[in-house]
């Protein structure tokens, strides 16, 4: 196990973001004995540590040169994107841009004529985009992130190149958690 993986496990425990309880269910309806709430990473130290862990992961897998912009979906992914690019710079001297989406397009101020769905303007024509988020269950939400990117590119007359996604926690289980309550068998997931 890599040090950043150990650090994540300790951070999940310390922050109580990982907890166990009967009667929990995932967004797709599957029962689960545990849940992870990255919303509890709500201090400067915790989000900074989480960003460092993600930056270390990206560098360990040699992904830091594979993207230009790190996009974090609203809401939890936004803070994660900022913390990760900051840690890439501070710990690895890798400078990358970040952006995150709005739930509704902005039509005033600097976005008066563009109805911008992204905040920082980091998405430039031809840029390579890595999407980063906290947890995945079925990947449906992550694939949904491609639509706002495509819409933004079309509105600006640009092209963006999604290169992948980075996650803190993969909830895609390969076997059912409770066989009696979820008789579908290994690998079956509900609709997210």
Residue ranges, per PLM feature:
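PRPP-associated nucleotide enzymes
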Residues: 1-132, 137-192
